[in-house]
A protein has these predicted regions:
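Residues at the C-termini of beta-strands that transition into short coil/loop
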Residues: 41, 111-114, 166
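Gly/Ser/Thr-rich loops at beta-strand to alpha-helix junctions
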Residues: 41-44, 96-99, 139-148, 169
């Protein structure tokens, strides 16, 4: 446990951002019956997976894999989640270079953010809270900022769905500059993670 905690602190010490580091930690420790966190898997991360779960202090029922939408699940994600997005009023938080016109679903509102958005665009959290939206589906494609958004927006307003979907839209948004293995039938596209 101590190793994982130290690893988190070491990772963010180089940015000298104690405030944002604390917000990231709060996002993994926040508890609510309708709030779920994604953790790394033991097959890819060994003991770090157990350390992360223990560090979060979450009930196991409120945990899933951080990569639940990718790897061997990506084709399922595209056939189910991606198709269902047209049934919602979508608010998308993604990189400012995103080509949202390529998406296979409509967006009601796009919030462009920069790289290191969890620091550079942190004020967006309060801006969204002030709008007091209802019945919206917020999709986060913004790195660690997605964790902060999901936590703080859910804590403030439980009348929406907040979903950190990571890199799943990158084939359409094309903001990352490279292709991930699971998009192109590579090794990870067949990778099946095991919980224990």
């Amino acid at each position: 446990m101590k190793d994982f905690t130290q690893e988190i602190y070491n990772l963010f010490d180089k940015f000298k951002t104690l405030f944002y580091k604390q917000k990231l930690i709060e996002s993994i420790k926040y508890k609510d019956s309708n709030y779920y966190i994604g953790t790394c898997c033991p097959c890819c991360n060994g003991d770090r997976a157990k350390q992360m779960r223990e560090f979060s202090n979450q009930n196991e029922d409120n945990m899933t894999f951080a990569n639940v939408f990718v790897n061997s699940n990506y084709s399922i994600y595209k056939e189910t989640f991606l198709k269902s997005y047209n049934n919602f009023d979508i608010h998308l938080i993604a990189n400012e270079k995103s080509k949202i016109e390529n998406l296979p679903f409509k967006i009601e509102k796009f919030y462009p953010v920069t790289f290191s958005a969890w620091i550079n665009n942190y004020s967006l959290i309060e801006e969204i809270k002030q709008q007091n939206f209802k019945n919206k589906l917020f999709l986060f494609c913004a790195g660690p900022f997605g964790n902060l958004l999901a936590h703080q927006l859910h804590e403030s307003n439980k009348q929406n769905i907040y979903l950190d979907i990571g890199s799943t839209l990158n084939p359409w948004l094309q903001s990352e500059g490279f292709k991930r293995d699971y998009y192109v039938n590579g090794y990870f596209s067949k990778r099946k993670c095991i919980w224990n």
